[in-house]
Amino acid sequence: MAETRSSPEERRPGGILRAAAVSRQFEGVRALERVTLELHRHEVVGLIGPNGAGKTTLVNLITGFDFPSSGTVELEEIDITAWPPHRRSRAGLARTFQQGHVFRGLTVRENVEVSALGVGARPTEARRRSEGLLGMLGLAQRAEQQAAVLPHGEERLLGVARALASEPRFLLMDEPAAGLHEAEVAEFAEVVRRVRDEHETGVLLIDHNIGLIMGVCDRIHVLDQGKTLAEGTPADVRRNVDVAAAYLGRRNGEGAE
């Protein structure tokens, strides 16, 4: 298979992933209103908010599965607003999905290799990435098993391995802890830290598990009714009265647990 490389412009090192004043309107309903979010490499940013706050809409705009009504999406100072998902992937932007997004008819190893091949890696390089990622995520013993037989928690990890196989500089994780039990959530938190620290990847983590968000994120961005409600460190967000009222179920200035 011939190796396909993205252009130097699309692989500029370093930088920031930025959604700048993005809005999205559906048939007269404004799902997002002038939201700005920045993600740097080597950090984890949490994105939280009530159901319907606009979290998945924002992720779709950033990853190219939808396009903003106004505003821009920028990857390392390049305007990628009109780029399709595959071009963003080759430029260093990856995403995991709520349902895992794995090929159930392939082996665990093949799932990861296909992702690497999809961004232009040669077969030998795809195998190297697969072996390294499966080892890091504790899936090496599952390498030759069909993805269809994986339990839920391991299927989520395979989704992460597939995303990392493209060697992204920025990774968006959509509800990765959904359906995981407490011990699996703790293990997953360590995976997120390793992705940030060992791969020097910026991670945008979208999840309803507040314990995970507070425990692993460097910064948190809160959406409510399509608008930015608050942003800051976990401690800042925990103390924010508006967040407590809108999302964490607290009133009258009490801090969230």
Where are these regions (language model features)?
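Glycine-rich phosphate-binding loops of nucleotide-dependent enzymes
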Residues: 2-257
